Amino acid sequence: MPLLEPSATAYGTFGDMRPDTEDEGERLLTDGYVSDDDGSAVTSVDSVQEGVRKIEAINITWTTRSLVIAYISIFLMAFCTSLEGQTIMSLSAYATSAFSKHSLISTVLVVQNVVNAVIKPPMAKIADVFGRFEAFCVSILIYVLGYIQMAASTNVQTYASAQIFYAAGSTGLQILQQVFIADSSSLLNRALLALLPELPFLVTVWIGPTIADVVLENSSWRWGYGMWSIILPASFLPLALSLLLNQRKAKRLNLIKERPHHRRGFVAAVRRTWYDLDIFGLALLSAAVTLILVPLTLAANTKNGWKSNSIVAMIVIGVVCLILLPFWETSKKLAPKPLLSLHLLKQRTALAGCCLAFFYFMAFYFSVQPYLYSYLQVVQGYDVATAGRVTQTFAFTSTIAAFGVSILIKYTRRYRVYVTLGCVIYMTGLLLMLLYRKEGSSPLQVLGTQVIVGMGGGLLNVPVQLGVQASASHQEVAAATAMFLTSMEMGGAVGAAISGAVWTHNIPRKLNLYLPDEYKSEAGAIFGKLTKALSYEMGTPVRSAINRSYQETMNKLLVLALLATLPLIPLSLLMSNYKLDKMSESSDHDDASPRNGLGPGERAKRT
């Protein structure tokens, strides 16, 4: 089956997308849709949200040419976002140096992780409520505003707030790209197509720093940020036109019927939007995650530490919000269309997949981000370029592994075996890290462990997402994808916060313990500035004390990473081993096998 074929079974109520079929109305009726007496207008049952109705109607109108154009645009957008990500890594140091204030940046990075976690569900809701085209436009707008604000920022506070806008826009694009791929592809092809946004990284990881150097030599870091506010919208144009033109085509064919509530007044529209987007649920989720995780990084730098009234108050309020969240989200009266489709977690496959993503990414933030780069420079003595390449090895190898496993899934029609295999390799790589990430280890040993962990991550990530999507109905495909990606980002946010707390608590204490007496007063400066730590020659008592402090702290993080991966293999075995070529996306109860496209009631084959 070709990767892009309009007649392919897609994620939705429509089993086949044939725009020229004469009996279109009859086919749609058999698929559970309601038609006018003349058979011309098609609407879904009232429970299906407007954005889902739009994309299902658009799916009928796709031609091979328009679908190829849409996917080319997805690739262009992914290439742009990947390239800018690699470019601004080199620009951020110059930007923060221009403000002569670095203390706020570490906290902003944690807030970015929180934004990445909480923005996916509301963006998925916007896609379901208003439409895919509208949601893409919102993400692009937020993204562009973030970059304009960064380019024009005159102080670190403005720069920090701009980073939050940027995080919201970029992570919104991430979820929407995956939702679009799920909308327009069959399960067998989805694993391969879902990798499309990741493929540019194989190239951009090497050329991004070069572009940053050219920008800095010929212009300024401000233009390095501002130019993406022009480039990204341009890359979105082909997809925007494809979605907009096919949506208009569907309206001309009378496949999208306006509902009566669309003609109601402003108050009714606001009330419906409040419930559709679950505004209060979003506020609870954001407050819970932010107020619990951010204090973990602030406590070490606060005067009274964990005894500070502000730290305690934030954590208490965050915990209260976290306790209230499931009650709110499961109340049909308060949240008739909840932000988090927690009932999806009643399905074993979805629950296991989301938990697996959480622990997998938590372990990543213990072992690779955010302190491996500093560790390699200080303890291993690597230069900037070498440390950067070793750190980037994980993403490079995981992308290659994900591409390989996507091809295997397409031809073996199974996914769970690769999840379990990926978990085993991932855990093995972390164990080898604990054994070989030592002072004096050879570059081959350090690099080899990164390659193994990257292979494991690539093998398990794509199949797990596929399994979670396969367990959901089309009305909930965006919600299921958002739940999976949110679980992953939540794991990353928790991992980043805990690793930050471990690092900030242990390094200063160990420096005060191991540094020669005459250098103990330098402990704060050594901890606060990487350049200060690197200024001492290898082999001197001071550098040996610094290296020992870094090494012992890194060992603690690696032990935490191993502990975080203990549930991975059992969770992988809890996921249903769907036979992907025998199923379509329809799941009505706990682990019910989605039905295939051959007829109602026919079960997918599972083992």
From Swiss-Prot:
GO molecular-function annotation terms? siderophore-iron transmembrane transporter activity
Highest rank taxon of the organism = Eukaryota
Parts of the chain that traverse the membrane:
67-89, 129-148, 186-208, 223-245, 279-301, 311-328, 349-368, 388-410, 417-436, 446-468, 481-503, 557-574
Query: What CDD domains does the entry give?
Result: MFS_ARN_like
Any single biological process term in GO: cellular response to iron ion starvation
Which cellular components does GO assign to this protein? plasma membrane
Provide the alphabetized UniProt keywords. Ion transport, Iron, Iron transport, Membrane, Transmembrane, Transmembrane helix, Transport
Tell me where it mainly resides: membrane
Q: How does it sit in the membrane?
A: Multi-pass membrane protein
Q: Where is the composition biased (Basic and acidic residues)?
A: 584-593
Subcellular localization, per the record?
Membrane
Q: Tell me which family the UniProt entry assigns to this protein.
A: Belongs to the major facilitator superfamily.
- Which protein are we looking at? Siderophore iron transporter mirC
The organism named in the record is: Emericella nidulans (strain FGSC A4 / ATCC 38163 / CBS 112.46 / NRRL 194 / M139)
